[in-house]
Regions:
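Long, non-catalytic protein-protein interaction scaffolds
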Residues: 1-168
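Structured, charged N-terminal subsegments at the starts of enzyme catalytic cores
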Residues: 156-243
Length: 243
């Protein structure tokens, strides 16, 4: 993949990271599934980028130094702060007031970054080191990240079908949050439809066919299970981006 600059201004990025941090702070007493959902609402669909001229599927996403993720290679694991990226981001700001706001974020996440908490709990001087450090027999962060998504079930049921399946079980906080997370994904799809319509305004006639297909299929997968290969690709892609 080729790194590209964030589409949003440094001020917009700072505001999003502050909103995420505030949601994380305010939801400390909640169940972890509810807390995750509240935090996700501050970054989705806000972090999605505009449709580009050669896109055949909707869904481009910016990653900030603070957020939520499932892999260390892009963003971070769970509630994360990539500290060296946050320090680099600070250099993009001009005012001392904005830099002080970044310092406040840095201080908060030193105590709350998932990887930092994990390492503080398990690292020791003799046997357990960080990934990758061959000085130790055991590497603490090996496979800390990653998960397997059930794409077959996603294709078989679609988003509304998954909601129905979840609601058929005895309700609890986790399952309720799962339903709300799927609703958030539908809001992400609504935003993608808006972005496609924006792209259509200046599109050449030869490009309109691609964008119209994209818009139609987004409308389908918002509530229905996919019926075509393109719809299946679009659903799995947008689902994976926010998973």
């Amino acid at each position: 993949s080729k790194p590209i600059p964030c589409e949003k201004s440094p001020q917009e990025q700072l505001a999003i990271m502050e909103a995420y941090t505030q949601a994380h702070r305010d939801s400390a007493a909640l169940d972890k599934a509810e807390r995750e959902l509240r935090c996700l609402r501050t970054i989705f669909p806000a972090l999605f980028r505009s449709i580009e001229d050669d896109d055949l599927l909707a869904g481009r996403l910016d990653f900030l130094p603070i957020g939520f993720g499932s892999v260390t290679s892009i963003g971070g694991v769970s509630h994360y702060c990539v500290f060296h990226k946050l320090r680099s981001f600070k250099e993009q700001l001009d005012s001392e007031e904005e830099k002080a706001r970044v310092d406040a974020l840095y201080a908060y996440w030193e105590e709350h970054d998932t990887k930092a908490i994990y390492c503080a709990d398990v690292l020791n001087e003799s046997t357990i080191g960080r990934f990758i450090d061959c000085s130790y027999p055991l590497m603490a962060t090996a496979r800390l990240s990653g998960m397997m998504l059930n794409y077959k079930k996603l294709m078989a049921y679609g988003l509304e079908g998954l909601k129905t399946l979840i609601r058929s079980q005895k309700p609890n906080t986790f399952l309720n949050s799962c339903v709300e997370s799927l609703t958030l994904l539908q809001e992400v799809i609504d935003r993608q439809i808006e972005l496609v319509r924006e792209a259509k305004l200046d599109a050449a006639r030869s490009r309109l066919q691609d964008l119209e297909l994209m818009e139609r299929d987004l409308a389908v997968i918002r509530t229905q299970k996919p019926a075509t290969f393109h719809q299946a690709l679009q659903l799995f892609w947008i689902y994976a981006l926010v998973a």
